[in-house]
Amino acid sequence: MDSNTVSSFQVDCFLWHVRKRFADQEMGDAPFLDRLRRDQKSLRGRGSTLGLDIDTATRVGKQIVERILEDESDEALKMTIASVPATRYLTDMTLEEMSRDWFMLMPKQKVAGSLCIRMDQAIMGKNIILKANFSVIFDRLETLILLRALTDEGAIVGEISPLPSLPGHTDEDVKNAIGVLIGGLEWNDNTVRVSETIQRFAWRSSNENGGPPLPPKQKRKMARTIESEI
């Protein structure tokens, strides 16, 4: 096992612990708490994959961070912060929409790279909007936190989420996953729109109504793909 992989996991565990202590003081905002929950799932998945105990990794991660901070001057810290590009966190969904459990009558699921696509294929003839919470850097999607498909009534009928055991995805991965989700939902005569935020950073739809920029023939092909593979 690569030593950098192990030490990276150990540092991530300790930094998560610090963020959790901060949240326990009731000082974290909604995006902060949202990332905290998602990162906890990711760390559990990575720990299982690596065969490492999280508590032990956290203690070792603390030692690594302490050694770094001992050698870090205030001036070097300022320069480091100034050189790091700013990441923006964009939220379509409320915390309630993000955390709400949902159930499928006809569950369908597909794993595409490090993303999991889920949908309820019992849903027919509904108006559906895709909403997402994600981070952006250099005006491009950096990390998808969660994307969900909601009906006009607010019911959740589909989602795209990162797999905790397979961290890392590109904006192109997210775009492809959105196409698969839309194709599957439209197969059942649902009308699907995407939020303005998703259009701008993850989908770049040319349809002013928020629909996907796919010709009908390609939509049908994509729908058949999801029908056979999910």
From Swiss-Prot:
GO cellular component terms, A-Z: host cell cytoplasm; host cell nucleus
Annotated spans, Disordered: 205-230
Assigned keywords, A-Z: Eukaryotic host gene expression shutoff by virus, Host cytoplasm, Host gene expression shutoff by virus, Host mRNA suppression by virus, Host nucleus, Host-virus interaction, Inhibition of host innate immune response by virus, Inhibition of host interferon signaling pathway by virus, Inhibition of host PKR by virus, Inhibition of host pre-mRNA processing by virus, Inhibition of host RIG-I by virus, Inhibition of host RLR pathway by virus, Interferon antiviral system evasion, RNA-binding, Ubl conjugation, Viral immunoevasion
Short sequence motif Nuclear localization signal: positions: 34-38
Molecular-function GO terms, alphabetical: protein serine/threonine kinase inhibitor activity; RNA binding
Description of post-translational modifications: Upon interferon induction, ISGylated via host HERC5; this results in the impairment of NS1 interaction with RNA targets due to its inability to form homodimers and to interact with host EIF2AK2/PKR.
Positions occupied by motif Nuclear export signal: 137-146
Region feature PABPN1-binding, mapped onto this chain: 223-230
GO biological process, one term: symbiont-mediated suppression of host gene expression
Assembly mode: Homodimer. Interacts with host TRIM25 (via coiled coil); this interaction specifically inhibits TRIM25 multimerization and TRIM25-mediated RIGI CARD ubiquitination. Interacts with human EIF2AK2/PKR, CPSF4, IVNS1ABP and PABPN1.
Record remark on domains: The dsRNA-binding region is required for suppression of RNA silencing.
Name of the featured protein: Non-structural protein 1
Organism: Influenza A virus (strain A/Fowl plague virus/Rostock/8/1934 H7N1)
